[in-house]
Amino acid sequence: MANKEELIEFEGVVTETLPNTMFRVRLENGHEVIAHISGKMRKHYIRILTGDSVKVEMTPYDLTKGRITYRAR
């Protein structure tokens, strides 16, 4: 598992909701990634809808997948 220092964080917008709490997110640099919700967001029932601004953590080893860690209000 990647250390906290190795994670890359991006801002993005949810463009599509996929099954099993997965989302397609368009990052600020134009790339699209598939992201899932972090455990704490799942635990606290934070809802994510299409069009929401989110923060996505990604590992440098696989830049096509990420984890949504924050939803902007």
Curated annotation (Swiss-Prot):
Gene3D superfamilies: Nucleic acid-binding proteins. Residues 1-73 form the S1-like domain. Keywords: Cytoplasm, Initiation factor, Protein biosynthesis, RNA-binding, rRNA-binding. It comes from the Bacteria. It holds the Pfam family eIF-1a. HAMAP family: IF_1 (MF_00075). Component of the 30S ribosomal translation pre-initiation complex which assembles on the 30S ribosome in the order IF-2 and IF-3, IF-1 and N-formylmethionyl-tRNA(fMet); mRNA recruitment can occur at any time during PIC assembly. Belongs to the IF-1 family. This is Translation initiation factor IF-1. It comes from Acinetobacter baumannii (strain ATCC 17978 / DSM 105126 / CIP 53.77 / LMG 1025 / NCDC KC755 / 5377). The gene is infA.
